């Protein structure tokens, strides 16, 4: 069984019930979520050994979060404790022409005050096959960025494959450095890079030539994105695979979804899914990443199948409430075979 380590921040998610706006809500629905933790949950669901690493405060909310992760089979034995609080994010789910809104309350969280040397990465990576991080973590604080680099360098030294989701969040970079300043050194240590057209442009100034996926409602011309992939590989020669997710947003409840994968001079394109009646798109990219890691580990000689698994897994996530993608390998494979009818399974 392959062992995957993920590192980042997990937060308390407080969502308005249904489609209520913040000013209408009299209560909030509490769950947990965070990019790297969401990936770990997906991988545990698929039967891999998944360990999530973070810094927790010592309080009952953190203990509840840990128990929640354990309930999905995610290990937390390498987590460290200290700091003041668990971060929080508030979610207002959009509908039709009204987009969803997220308000963060994560300043001074435990991971925001993490420092190099607090985590023994040599021990964390014992027996590990894969390490995953996202661009959200180095955006939190200089300390979080330093520890992320520390982890990547240890993984490289120990022969552990490294993946990243660029995941650019402009509102998080508040500690005096920009993503363009910090990310290149981190991404240079990655074997697999995932992003979208906005990530590539905002962080590295790389654009698809003459194509805007948002203007075409998700009609994907894969060749237009080959230039993004080749430019990323030229900038980061360690990378063996570059993957671009392609989301077309017709409205808040109706998206198109697909992706392309570039490796060894070949560009693979997934089927394009038309996702109507979205239940919850938060965690959609994380479910793609979880599916991709599983696919690349399970189908090492079949990049097309790995990509198709990632897209199908993420498509199913859009039907599930909460950050986590709670589906099985069999359910994903059924959708890959074309079984998207939604009929009762007996």
Give the residues covered by each predicted segment.
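Positively charged, low-complexity intrinsically disordered leader regions
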Residues: 1-21
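Short catalytic helix/loop segments, enriched in acidic residues and glycine
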Residues: 21-40
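Alpha-helix C-terminal capping segments
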Residues: 38-49, 295-299
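Conserved N-terminal subdomain of the carbohydrate kinase-like
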Residues: 49-136, 332-346
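Hydrophobic beta-strand scaffold residues
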Residues: 50, 76, 162-163, 194
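A short helix->loop->beta-strand "cap" motif at the edges of active sites that frequently abuts
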Residues: 154-161, 236-240
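Conserved phosphate/ATP/ADP-binding segment of small-molecule kinases
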Residues: 172-264
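Conserved post-catalytic alpha-helical subdomain immediately downstream of the catalytic base
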Residues: 252, 268-339
């Amino acid at each position: 069984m392959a062992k995957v380590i993920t590192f980042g921040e997990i937060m308390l998610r407080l969502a308005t019930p249904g489609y209520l706006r913040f000013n209408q809500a009299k209560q909030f629905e509490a769950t947990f979520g965070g990019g790297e933790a969401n990936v770990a949950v997906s991988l545990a669901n698929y039967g891999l050994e998944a360990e999530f690493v973070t810094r927790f405060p010592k309080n009952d909310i953190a203990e509840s979060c840990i128990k929640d992760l354990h309930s999905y089979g995610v290990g937390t034995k390498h987590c460290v404790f200290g700091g003041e609080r668990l971060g929080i994010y508030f979610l207002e789910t959009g509908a039709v022409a009204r987009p969803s809104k997220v308000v963060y309350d994560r300043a001074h969280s435990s991971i925001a005050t993490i420092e190099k040397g607090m985590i023994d990465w040599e021990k964390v990576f014992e027996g590990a096959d894969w390490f995953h991080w996202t661009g959200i973590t180095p955006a939190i604080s200089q300390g979080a960025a330093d520890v992320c680099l520390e982890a990547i360098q240890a993984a490289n030294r120990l022969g552990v494959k490294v993946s990243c989701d660029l995941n650019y969040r402009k509102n998080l970079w508040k500690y005096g450095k920009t993503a363009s300043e910090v990310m290149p050194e981190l991404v240079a240590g990655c074997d697999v890079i995932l992003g979208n057209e906005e990530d590539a442009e905002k962080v590295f100034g790389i654009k698809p030539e003459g194509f805007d996926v948002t203007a075409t409602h998700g009609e994907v011309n894969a060749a237009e994105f080959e230039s993004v992939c080749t430019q990323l590989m030229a900038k980061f020669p360690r990378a063996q695979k570059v993957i671009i997710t392609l989301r077309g947003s017709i409205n808040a409840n109706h998206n198109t979804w697909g992706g392309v994968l570039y490796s060894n001079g070949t560009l693979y394109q997934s089927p394009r899914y038309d996702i109507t009646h979205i239940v919850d798109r938060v965690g959609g990219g994380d479910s793609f990443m979880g599916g991709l890691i599983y696919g690349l580990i399970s189908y090492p000689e079949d990049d097309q199948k790995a990509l198709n698994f990632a897209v199908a897994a993420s498509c199913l996530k859009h039907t599930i409430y909460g950050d986590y993608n709670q589906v099985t390998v069999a359910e994903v494979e059924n959708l890959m075979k074309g079984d998207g009818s939604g009929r009762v399974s007996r």
